[in-house]
Each structure stands twice: as C-alpha cells, then as structure tokens.
C-alpha cells in the first residue's frame, strides 16, 4: 500500500522521557545536545534517526503529522528545540482519542483544500496497543512501536 500520510505518536515513539519526579512533564527546556533536552524534573531524548527519517519522507513527498496525548505547549517547545517542528502538518495534541486525532488531521487537509487523503492512505505509529487498535478501526494501517517495529531505523527500512 502506498501511504501518503504518516502519523506519529511522540512519547516512546519519536522520543523517550525520563522523569526524576512524579510531576507532569513541563518546560522550559534547554538543549543539552542535539538529541536531548532537560526540563523541570524530566529529560526528553529524541530517538536517533528521527531527523533522517523525516527528511527522507519529505523528499519522497509524504505528508507527516502527529497525534499525541501530551501538553501542546510542551510538545511545541520540544519539537522546536529539536528542530523538527516544521516537518509536521496539522499536528494534534491533547487528550482526545487517537482515532479522533487522526480523523482531525484528515479533516484539516480537506478543509484547506490541499489534499483529500483517505484513512486507507494513512500509516499510524504508536507505542500503545489500544491507540493502534482504535486507529486501525477507522481504516488506517498501523504499527505498534516496540512490537511491530523496534527502532526508527527499522521503520525507515519499511517505509523505503
């Protein structure tokens, strides 16, 4: 199947979070190196290969978006710090169901008249089985990060 839109989760899919306390993840963050940002009681590490994967998808004219159950301000800050915020079209942040988030991404494409993408042209990647199952229910293809694929590099090979 030819996927036109790849939708990623963030936490434990494109980056990992280590927390030193039980507080919600929050900034401000500062970049420690190109893959690591430190905030108030947490360290966020962008998985190796994410930037390369995003560049390759862009070169192949694939649309890329996000569906993350995270604080929008935190997500935006981290995406900017890691230098990848421009890669994602119509990202969805907040506490909505992932199937709703993906549907909202598709609607945003239709609303601006840019593209009509069907759920069957979407690949959704998440680390949580219930999220993957919910998005599969709208007709999208899915991959469970950690089971179907174990790394960004493995995903890059699948998407070639």
Where are the regions that the model predicts?
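Asp-based, Mg2+/Mn2+-dependent phosphohydrolase catalytic module
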Residues: 1-6, 29, 45, 86-89, ...
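Active-site neighborhood of HAD-like aspartate-dependent phosphohydrolases
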Residues: 1-55, 59
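Conserved Rossmann-like nucleotide-cofactor binding loop
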Residues: 13, 20, 72, 130, ...
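Residues at the C-termini of beta-strands that transition into short coil/loop
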Residues: 18, 92-95, 146
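A short acidic (Asp/Glu
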Residues: 19, 75-78, 132-136
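Preference for well-ordered, secondary-structure-rich cores of eukaryotic proteins
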Residues: 19-22, 55-62, 112-117, 130
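Substrate-recognition element of Asp-dependent hydrolases with the DxDx(T/V) motif
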Residues: 41, 45, 50-79, 90-96
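Histidine/lysine/aspartate-rich catalytic loop segments that bind and position anionic ligands
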Residues: 82
């Amino acid at each position: 199947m030819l996927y036109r839109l790849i939708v990623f989760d963030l936490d434990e899919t494109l980056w990992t979070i280590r927390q030193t306390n039980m507080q919600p993840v929050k900034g401000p963050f500062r970049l420690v190196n190109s893959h690591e940002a430190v905030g108030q009681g947490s360290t966020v590490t962008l998985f190796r290969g994410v930037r390369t994967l995003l560049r390759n998808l862009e070169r192949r004219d694939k649309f890329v978006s996000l569906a993350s159950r995270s604080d929008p301000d935190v997500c935006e800050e981290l995406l900017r710090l890691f230098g990848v915020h421009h890669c994602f079209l119509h990202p969805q942040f907040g506490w909505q169901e992932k199937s709703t988030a993906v549907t909202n991404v598709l609607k945003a494409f239709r609303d601006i008249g840019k593209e009509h993408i069907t759920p069957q042209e979407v690949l959704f990647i998440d680390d949580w089985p219930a999220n993957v199952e919910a998005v599969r229910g709208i007709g999208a293809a899915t991959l469970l990060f950690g089971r179907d694929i174990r790394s960004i590099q493995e995903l890059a090979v699948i998407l070639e």
